[in-house]
């Protein structure tokens, strides 16, 4: 479940991706150490970077991302960041810009057809496990709406605990609480099944044991445990 940067390097080197669209959070991309690693890794690839500017995933910025992806025509989208970055990438890979997009989102009626290209995600927070879920969130006029489709599932994800450790405590705290809340919600949901209950129970056990130490003294061990807890919660 846990990866190393060498796993990402092997993935990029062993595939025929020539054009890579990188979607990331401007601050987290730098502070996590991802910027240095990926600039070297992608040095011989044609890349386009898009830095997320809105704290929440909003329709206006989503449209800009879709427009940038369609004009660049990548064969891989690489999402490196927290839940908002990953949700943006998941949605942008399956949604087209159209005049009635806002109405379709609000009415939960977007006609999903296919993915635009391959999507790989690397979380820089340990939160709701967006890398393994088939749903994503977008805000329209300040109101939260959800997309849900199997097409939203990323094709690949990589859990790199080292990328989590330098996040601000406020980010670590809210993301970790997200993982705990998601696991609790799964345990009491009427839609839960034996497998989801098993994953949620494991997630809760790990996160409760590691959450406080991850905030007070982040290290590779508790960052790894929170990565696992987040992934299981998703």
Language-model-detected regions and their locations in the chain:
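Structural motif
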Residues: 19-21, 48, 75-78, 117-123, ...
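ATP/NTP phosphate-donor binding region
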Residues: 1-76
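Short Gly/Thr/Asp-enriched flexible loops that form oxyanion-binding sites at enzyme active sites
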Residues: 37, 66, 85-99, 132-135
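Glycine/serine-rich anion-binding loops at beta->alpha junctions
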Residues: 74-90, 124-130
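A glycine/threonine-rich phosphate-anchoring loop and its flanking beta-alpha core
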Residues: 98-194
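Short, hydrophobic/aliphatic alpha-helical segments
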Residues: 62-74, 162, 219-234
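Active-site segments that bind and position negatively charged phosphate/pyrophosphate groups
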Residues: 186, 190-234
């Amino acid at each position: 479940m846990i990866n190393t940067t060498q796993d990402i390097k092997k993935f990029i080197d062993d595939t025929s991706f020539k054009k890579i669209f990188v979607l990331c959070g401007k601050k987290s991309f730098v502070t996590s150490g991802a910027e240095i690693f990926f600039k070297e890794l992608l040095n011989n690839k044609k890349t386009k970077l898009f830095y997320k500017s809105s704290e929440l995933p909003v329709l206006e910025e989503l449209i800009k991302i879709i427009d940038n992806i369609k004009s660049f025509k990548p064969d891989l989208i690489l999402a490196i960041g927290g839940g908002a970055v990953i949700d943006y990438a998941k949605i942008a890979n399956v949604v087209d810009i159209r005049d009635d997009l806002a109405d379709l989102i609000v009415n939960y009626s977007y006609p999903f057809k296919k993915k635009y290209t391959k999507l790989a995600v690397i979380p820089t927070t340990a939160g709701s496990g967006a890398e393994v879920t088939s749903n994503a969130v977008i805000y329209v006029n300040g109101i939260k709406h959800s997309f849900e489709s199997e097409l939203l599932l990323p094709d690949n994800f990589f859990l790199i605990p080292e990328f989590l450790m330098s996040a601000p405590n406020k980010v670590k705290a809210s993301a970790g609480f997200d993982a705990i809340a998601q696991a609790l919600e799964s345990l009491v949901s009427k839609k839960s099944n034996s497998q989801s209950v098993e994953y949620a129970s494991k997630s809760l056990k790990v996160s409760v044991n590691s959450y406080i130490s991850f905030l007070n003294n982040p290290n590779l061990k508790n960052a790894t445990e929170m990565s696992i807890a987040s992934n299981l919660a998703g």
